[in-house]
């Protein structure tokens, strides 16, 4: 998504990842991605132009017999063989439609300390009366564990909105 002329929303996430020392990034694309490929180029803008790791753009149909995906789980499934050959211990997933300067290192540390299978980043936000929430809303217990996940929640007041940023340990 274009932002302020020459930038795109993906630039915020990539810059945050680069600033946290993440040097192996794969952008999983679905459709109409030619201009995105032109924009990202080799990844040099984020110091990710490398022979090993760096910035990878993973188009749909990269694997034989894989159909275009419709959600995050299908996207991961479609790149499973790609993920299996990576050497990094953790996978950080983030949508690229958010203007954010995010500390992925803090999220990774929280994930490691929690012992959870998946750690999700969320933000407490005030939802006005009558406004439909198009994000996932999380209910968390006293230990910070997600106990409920709602979509299109209509409840007003303070809500925990999913930022669509996740971290998990890769199974080897």
Predicted regions and their residues:
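Unchanged
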Residues: 1-172
């Amino acid at each position: 998504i274009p932002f302020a002329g020459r930038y795109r929303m993906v630039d915020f996430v990539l810059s945050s990842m680069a600033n946290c020392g993440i040097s192996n990034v794969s952008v999983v694309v679905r459709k109409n991605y030619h201009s995105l490929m032109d924009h990202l180029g080799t990844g040099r803008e984020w110091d990710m132009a490398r022979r090993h790791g760096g910035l990878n753009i993973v188009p749909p149909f990269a694997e034989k017999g894989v159909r275009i995906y419709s959600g995050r789980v299908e996207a991961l499934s479609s790149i499973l063989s790609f993920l299996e050959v990576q050497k990094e211990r953790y996978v950080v997933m983030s949508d690229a439609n958010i203007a954010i300067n995010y500390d992925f290192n803090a999220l990774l540390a929280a994930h490691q300390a929690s012992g959870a299978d998946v750690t999700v980043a969320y933000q407490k936000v005030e939802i006005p009366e009558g406004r439909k929430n198009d994000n996932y809303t999380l209910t968390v217990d006293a230990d910070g564990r997600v106990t409920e996940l709602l979509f299109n929640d209509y409840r007003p007041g303070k809500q925990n909105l999913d930022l669509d940023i996740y971290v998990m340990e890769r199974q080897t």
